[in-house]
Amino acid sequence: MIQAARQIASGLSAYPKAIRLIRKNRLGKFLVLPVVFNIIVVVALVFAGYGLGDWIGDIIERHTENMNGWIQAAMVAIKIVLPVIFFIVFIFIGGTVVNVLMSPIYTILSEKAETILTGKEFPFSARQTAKDIWRALRIALRNTAKQLLLTFLCLFLNFIPVVGSIASVCLIFVINAYYFGSGFMDYTFERWRYSVTESSKGTSQLKYLAIANGAVYSLPLYLFCGTFFAAFIGGVSAVAATISQIELKARP
């Protein structure tokens, strides 16, 4: 219990430290590209929804000679609803998509944070950097698959009135927090030359840290505003995870 409390406290307290570190050392430039990319994806999905709505509407119009009021109303509804659906889908999967695509940048950001904190330099190697980025992408995709599967299974709890719905929301939040957090922690584990298996074991030993770190990232997503800030929060989360791991490693 003490270990769990220590890990949770470390995970949460690392965020203000991460923000100060990023600001003091001018690392904010590494968050610009993810934020711009995030905005582009949101806009693209909304326009894709409008485009698909127009396309479906044209098909209906071509195959319907005499459109009555109901069909016209349906066409208008499709054009309005599809962009909303696309946007809602991004709200729920946006954090995951951003994590997968931005993992190369988060890898670099985490490395710079460790260098600042410990003074340890990591000589640049194009080959090693490519290997680290590839590993980060593989782990992000693996975690995403597990995350989505467990989230889908939790949805069945909604068939149990009230209690099941509450349990489903809570479990999905914890699952997402754990896998987001473990992904951010792996950026440090890969620099410590942990194998994928060793990284999984390390995350299991620090599971409460993973949940605390990922919870800060996940909570805004549940509040429907986090999708716009997922890229920024993700960068801070990667640095926060590095800070926590170094702190806990230094403790006896």
Give the residues covered by each predicted segment.
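Small-residue-enriched transmembrane helix starts and helix-helix packing motifs
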Residues: M1, S10, I211-V216, A241
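Anchoring transmembrane alpha helix of integral membrane proteins
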Residues: M1-N25, K29-P34, I39-A44
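Membrane-interface segments at transmembrane-helix boundaries
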Residues: A5-P16, D58-G69, T96-A136, G183-S204, ...
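Interfacial aromatic "cap" segments that immediately flank transmembrane helices
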Residues: A18-V36, F122-L153, F180-P220
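Hydrophobic alpha-helical transmembrane segments in multi-pass membrane proteins
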Residues: V35-G49, F86-I91, R142-L171, N213-G234
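Long, highly hydrophobic alpha-helical transmembrane signal-anchor segments
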Residues: F47-F92, A130-F156
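Selective recognition of hydrophobic, aromatic-rich stretches within alpha-helical transmembrane segments
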Residues: K79-E114, N158-R191, L223-P252
